[in-house]
Amino acid sequence: MKRALLSVSDKTGLVSFAKGLIDRGFELVSTGGTHRELAAAGIAVTSVEEVTGFPEMLDGRVKTLHPKIHAGILARRDDPAHMEALADHDIQPVDLVCVNLYPFAATIKRPDVTRAEAIEQIDIGGPSALRAAAKNSDSVWAVVDPADYEAVLTGLDQDDAHLRQKLAAKVFAITAAYDAQIVHYLDPEPFPEHFTPTYTKRQDLRYGENSHQQAAFYVEPDPNPTSLAAAKQLHGKELSYNNIKDADAALAMLREFSEPAVVAVKHMNPCGIGLGKTIEGAWDKAYAADPMSIFGGIIALNRPVDLATAEKMHKLFLEIIMAPAFDDDAYAVLAKKKNVRLLTINTADTPAELGTETTAIYGGLLIQARDNQTETPADLTVVTTVKPTDEQLKALAFAQTVVKHVKSNAIVVAQADQTLGIGAGQMNRIGSVELALTQAQQNDNFAGAVMASDAFFPMDDCVDYAAKHDIKAIIQPGGSIRDKDSIEKANQYGIAMVTTGVRHFRH
């Protein structure tokens, strides 16, 4: 008779799976709570103690860790010496191991969890039995996920070796992820000696950045509730690879603002950001910032969408609209377009709470702290004769907040509540200045605009160009060996200039 070892913390589907195994000629061996569950259902089951001749001990820490279990799992059926050793020690082979692991991740999510409670949820016997079965998957079934029970029963009928190998790989993936979560809990160092992240596939994507590239979306085991991975899609087509990247960028920008704000993004750069007393007012500012580029854009709002705002957005082709909520009548209007993706998001986090970010390179990975720096008035140094007005300081602070989210070389022209022109990704800074000002001057709200730069001005040509296009104040990090030239040029034109001492490159 074949033997199956069952020891599960998640009892989903257990009884029907056990009955299926019995129907296929298996003897069931089980531990603790699993044994009680099966016995209560009237299923014949043998306890592990009866097999090993040794009781469970240490409050259940030692149950299946015994040669009569592990030898039965690990013995190679095609090796006469292995089978003879089993016979000599009166050990029966174990042909299927069904184990799922203690809920460590769920335990550490509890805000009041103690270290002792977390440690008790580190499974030892479960991973050991599963890994043993997976190692010997030429003969032994390793089952870790209740979602696989039906497939396993069918696979047993067909002696499906391919499925057995696939499930073995799944075991090693899940136990590796499980161990990674334990590592991170015990040592949450952001730059550890060994970096062991773990992600689970959320979905296969139609394609990647371009149609000839394959892609999939993976998420952390327990995504931050304010992350895009935790957003809920209410309506529209499936998110694409580019949608996900753009939406994440939009959400990062949105976190910067506490007042009603609307962020519009194209190709991971902002094309319009507006602030207002109401979310409708913020939308009006964001739209007016660049009515052309917003077409086909990703929109993020930090207040619920009301009917008036929805009716305005509905007039445009937009890829995504994200907000904390949608009023019922607003949702009804927006959902008339079957393809627009409507997502609810949580915007509670501030940028300072977001930890690290990673960038893959060929053969490696870069990890850095996110650019959470936000300059305060105390960080600013006025370096020109002319000092900025209070209103200009507000506009400079807003432009400075936006510019760190723009691809370098980055220039932002703005008022205190609205971007007017954005120059992104140019290989020389004057090119970004020209782009930003060309766009900004088309805006009816241009008079009195200010300019922000993500890095210092290597020459005074940027200030010269800004002055000729009526910029009244500039904020930049400073630090160039030619700072003096730019400052003198600003003084010549009567422009107020403020330095921060902080660069905000974005690649």
Curated annotation (Swiss-Prot):
The chemistry this enzyme catalyses reads: (6R)-10-formyltetrahydrofolate + 5-amino-1-(5-phospho-beta-D-ribosyl)imidazole-4-carboxamide = 5-formamido-1-(5-phospho-D-ribosyl)imidazole-4-carboxamide + (6S)-5,6,7,8-tetrahydrofolate; IMP + H2O = 5-formamido-1-(5-phospho-D-ribosyl)imidazole-4-carboxamide
Keywords attached to this Swiss-Prot or TrEMBL record, sorted alphabetically, are: Hydrolase, Multifunctional enzyme, Purine biosynthesis, Transferase
Q: Name one GO cellular component term.
A: cytosol
Family membership, please give it.
Belongs to the PurH family.
| Protein name, entry field | Bifunctional purine biosynthesis protein PurH
Any one of the GO BP annotations: 'de novo' IMP biosynthetic process
* Residues in MGS-like domain copies: 1-144
Its source organism is Lacticaseibacillus paracasei (strain ATCC 334 / BCRC 17002 / CCUG 31169 / CIP 107868 / KCTC 3260 / NRRL B-441)
